[in-house]
């Protein structure tokens, strides 16, 4: 992944004007004006679709568990795009408010953990699980809480460790999903996970690839959209309509 990032180094090309130089591992990259605008737009665009999509799941809910899961997932999905947009807007237009920007950056990273947990909630709550696998319903929230505590104490200090935490948080609950008796939607989940993994190349490429963080945002949106489709189709769509969709 990181070898590919080194190959895609645009610092000595005509596109270098769209990005700033790389910074040491312990410092935060400062985007150009172009990149700031792209960072805001690439997540702001998805706020309304995420609200509409979450509302759709709520209205398709047939029981309390489906309603609760729709709320949890919807809050995680909308929260991700809203918090990211607010942080990048403040970072761009109000960068002199250092403490506010720093706090929002921490919240932005914390929300990712809860977004991952919320993305698994419908699968863990609405699908049949084994006696041991059912513990993952609450374990994902413990993992999200641990990740939040880590960000609070070690924000931007050990970036590779932070990235590893996101990867573990993203893949560990998937082991339970794969073991479910009903595996409908697995391919969509794997496709969404692939979008996130490919996006990590750009997540670690600020200063090498112009608009790297904005491209990462797009991969996040594609991954989230794929996972939303799987949740809508296999967990909320009435069985009669599922048959029509699959044809």
From Swiss-Prot:
Family membership: Belongs to the ADIPOR family.
Membrane topology according to the record: Multi-pass membrane protein
Organism: Mus musculus (Mouse)
Positions on the Cytoplasmic side per record topology: 1-39, 88-103, 155-159, 204-210
Main location: Golgi
Transmembrane stretches, start-end: 40-60, 67-87, 104-124, 134-154, 160-180, 183-203, 211-231
NCBIfam families: hlyIII (TIGR01065)
Entries under InterPro entries matching the protein: AdipoR/HlyIII-related, Hy-lIII
Disulphide bonds in the chain: none
Keywords carried by this UniProt record: Golgi apparatus, Membrane, Receptor, Transmembrane, Transmembrane helix
GO cellular component assignments: Golgi membrane; perinuclear region of cytoplasm
GO biological process, one term: positive regulation of neuron differentiation
Location in or out of the cell: Golgi apparatus membrane
Origin superkingdom: Eukaryota
Full protein name: Monocyte to macrophage differentiation factor 2
Molecular function via GO: pore-forming activity; protein kinase activity
Pfam families from the UniProt entry: HlyIII (PF03006)
């Amino acid at each position: 992944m990181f070898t590919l990032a080194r190959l895609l180094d645009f610092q000595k090309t005509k596109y270098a004007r769209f990005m700033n130089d790389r910074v040491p591992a312990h410092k935060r990259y400062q985007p150009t004006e172009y990149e700031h605008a792209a960072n805001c737009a690439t997540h702001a665009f998805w706020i309304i679709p995420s609200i509409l999509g979450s509302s759709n799941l709520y209205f398709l809910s047939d029981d309390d568990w489906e309603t609760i899961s729709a709320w949890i997932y919807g809050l995680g999905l909308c929260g991700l795009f809203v918090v990211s947009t607010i942080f990048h807007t403040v970072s761009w237009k109000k960068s002199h408010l250092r403490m506010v920007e720093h706090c929002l950056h921490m919240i932005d990273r914390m929300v990712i953990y809860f977004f991952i947990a919320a993305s698994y909630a419908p699968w863990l709550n609405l699908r049949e699980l084994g006696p041991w696998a059912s513990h993952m319903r609450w374990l994902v929230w413990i993992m999200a809480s641990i990740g939040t505590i880590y960000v609070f104490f070690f924000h931007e200090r050990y970036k590779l460790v932070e990235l590893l935490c996101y990867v573990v948080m993203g893949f560990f609950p998937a082991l339970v999903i794969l073991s479910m008796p009903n595996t409908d939607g697995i391919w969509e989940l794997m496709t969404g996970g692939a979008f996130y993994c490919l996006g990590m190349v750009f997540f670690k490429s600020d200063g090498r690839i112009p608009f790297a963080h904005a491209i990462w945002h797009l991969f996040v949106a594609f991954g989230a959209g794929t996972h939303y489709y799987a949740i809508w189709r296999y967990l909320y769509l009435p069985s009669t309509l599922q048959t029509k969709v699959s044809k």
